[in-house]
Amino acid sequence: MQKIKSLMTRQGLKSPPESLNDLGAFESLRVPGKEEFRELREQPSDPQAEQELINSIEQVYFSADPFDIVKYELEKLPPVLNLQELEEYRDKLKQQQSAVSKKVADLILEKQPAYVKELERVTSLQTGLQLAAVICTNGRRHLNIAKEGFTQASLGLLANQRKRQLLIGLLKSLRTIKTLQRTDIRLSEMLEEEDYPGAIQLCLECQKAASTFKHYSCISELNSKLQDTLEQIEEQLDVALSKICKNFDINHYTKVQQAYRLLGKTQTAMDQLHMHFTQAIHNTVFQVVLGYVELCAGNTDTKFQKLQYKDLCTHVTPDSYIPCLADLCKALWEVMLSYYRTMEWHEKHDNEETAAAAEGSNVMSTEEATFDRGYVKKKLEHGLTRIWQDVQLKVKTYLLGTDLSIFKYDDFIFVLDIVSRLMQVGEEFCGSKSEVLQESIRKQSVNYFKNHHRIRLDELRMFLENETWELCPVKSNFSILQLHEFKFLEQSRSPSVSPSKQPSATSSKPVTLFEQYCSGGNPFEIQADHKDEETEDVLASNGYESDEQEKSAYQDYDSDSDVPEELKRDYVDEQTGDVPVKSVSRETLKSRKKSDYSLNKVNAPILTNTTLNVIRLVGKYMQMMNILKPIAFDVIHFMSQLFDYYLYAIYTFFGRNDSLESTGLGLSSSRLKTTLNRIQESLIDLEGSADPTATLTAAEERKEKVPSPHLNQLVILTSGDTLYGLAERVVATESLVFLAEQFEFLQPHLDAVMPAVKKPFLQQFYSQTVSTASELRKPIYWIVAGKAIDYEQMLLLMMNVKWDVKEIMSQHNIYVDALLKEFEQFNKRLNEVSKRVRIPLPVSNILWEHCIRLANRTIVEGYANVKKCSNEGRALMQLDFQQFLMKLEKLTDIRPIPDKEFVETYIKAYYLTENDMERWIKEHREYSTKQLTNLVNVCLGSHINKKARQKLLAAIDEIDRPKR
């Protein structure tokens, strides 16, 4: 019945819940037979109507709980029975029964094939069980036969054999236990041999074997002994791990790592390793500093050993400061190199293990190993920053323990060089910018450099005041890179190894310090050696001085006996890079010196000893800036002050002349004036002595300033024979131009280290100061030009000329010859000066331009002094000027002649009509009021009347009014 209900449920029907017992209550609800099924199927059916009948059956009939159907139906009857209603209800129940029976019949017929198939399977199973029963019966019969065939003796033999096997096993166990008891001797030997993996492997195997025999009473004591041995191995292993921190050995470290891996303590080993590195840094720096302190103290007092590291650093003497710092950095380098090689080892073995794991099949062990490798990698990467931070703090404490302001410049530079190399190590070690080290030395460097710079400025003033402005002869191919102070520029562009050891590798990838010194050596040892080598290079001979024959030939043409010693050092040909060979013939040397002399005359730089000192000072400043880039701005600012002071001194000595500005020729550009005013306000102490009433702020400001320099009394600038000190003026001015050129050459190097926010200062310095150096030529050489020609004498000669002639003259006036004679004399004296000092073409052109410009303006001034002039007189003026130009062009190559139009335009203005002259006066404001007024007065009576004269004079006055 349950099966029928489940079938009806899957068909979406609600089956009545009556059981077989319930069916007995109503005969009408019994299961129909086959005949009845057939009749039910043959009856015409309406599926929809049947479904509605089934749906109309009450829910209680589908309940799984048993209940009394008869009682249920009787209780439903009303108190008053109605026969018709009862019959209708009965018919309804019959219809519902019929519908359910028909549905059940359909479902049974539908499942008939499955029933047949299941019945066949049951029959087959029954057959198999019967066969199994037969086999079991046969087996029991055979067992009984075998049991009856064995005797008691056979069973006894088997028991003895079993006992024998047990005794053999016991003997093996006893021998193994005996071997385990003697294992401690072998373990001690292996520990002495530092075979930690083997010792641990043996100990673990013994423990594993002992656990097999734990049922023996003697094994418990052995287990305890093995555990103690294992702990002893771990202690020795930790000691071995600590040795890695100062001297990394691949084989040693490989054994240690294998041992920790066998113990399953790879992560613990890494934690211990970092602790040992931290301890190694502390112990190393303390021992190094303690050694120097005790050495300098000269006694064996143990009080220093009880001091803290910070207090110990204050006891380092200045003499031992640099060696101690170098040894400190060497020792710290060894620690960091060991850490670097440790990371290399792990990286290499990680790759090997990853490749091996890819071929293996043990997934669980591979995952665990991968996790360990990941932990070790992260720990090592994190340790980089931590270790470098410890190194920085230790070195910072050492640096701040001594006052560096008392050090000599070279010693201070060497300290900075060591610290800079250490910061380079830090950047390669972990990518750190070493803020701790930079900050610790930046303030000291700035303070040191301020004091140093102040002393250098005072020295520069002393040099300038003692300078006689004599030419310092140098080679035609002289370059500041040949100077010792600028060697670092070439070294910074080449590898730090010597050329003989430099590999001929084509790869452009830079070699790090760790790669370079991984197999041996120390970058801080190279640093000290490098300094010694440079000192020897500076003192080296140039290869000519040792041979007297060659030296005499050299002196025949260009003796360099007066060349400063610093310029004789380390001369190398720029074209070949080779030192001149000593074994050359006298003739070859002579011809070479002739060509050198010629080059010197044409191209040799013009500079003085003071200029050279400034250049050397700039090189030293750049060395400090290159080593300590955070103070680059301060250093460049001080460098600019060196140039400013040199420029101001040249202007003060040779270019300051109030009469220059009155000419109105714009000899000093507005940019040059602004620069000079800025220098005077910011750098020059004009008071000369301290004012006791000055405020503290003013006193501090004056400390930053330098008194204005005074020209050496030996320099004579008033002699006409020397063209008023032209040689000294040329040397001074052109040395400034040369200095500016060197600053231009160094600009890319300065720009590379200047902080981005400060680069506008550098750009302004170059655009407003360095570029104005050549502009000093005009005011300085103008003073020579103003005195070299006797312009006053020419004016007197012009005043004696009669200009109101009535006929056209064919002969020029005598003042023209006098002026040309002055120019010839000027040219002669200029040639005399050029024998002492090479006069560059730009200087020669400026001198000639100034002289010609002054001469032409003097001519106009002379014409403006004329009281009466006729048309023929004006023609005579033109004749004189043309004659002057024709002869002048033979003396100079300057084209066009300066201010030529200035004279010609003034002469031609005489012929202008009233209206044209008024317009001309307004357009030509380059002429003075006197010159314009004289022009109008001279024209009066010829072609201008008095009324027109008044009008023109009023126009001139109107033009002149804004100038007052």
From Swiss-Prot:
Cross-link (Glycyl lysine isopeptide (Lys-Gly) (interchain with G-Cter in SUMO2)): K963
Main location: other
Keyword Transferase: no
Cross-link (Glycyl lysine isopeptide (Lys-Gly) (interchain with G-Cter in SUMO1)) at residue(s): K963
Residue ranges that the Swiss-Prot or TrEMBL entry lists as coiled coil: 81-107, 216-244
Family in the record: Belongs to the syndetin family.
Oligomeric and partner information: Component of the endosome-associated retrograde protein (EARP) complex, composed of VPS51, VPS52, VPS53 and VPS50/Syndetin. The EARP complex interacts with EIPR1. Interacts with VPS51 and VPS53 in an EIPR1-independent manner.
Record-given protein name: Syndetin
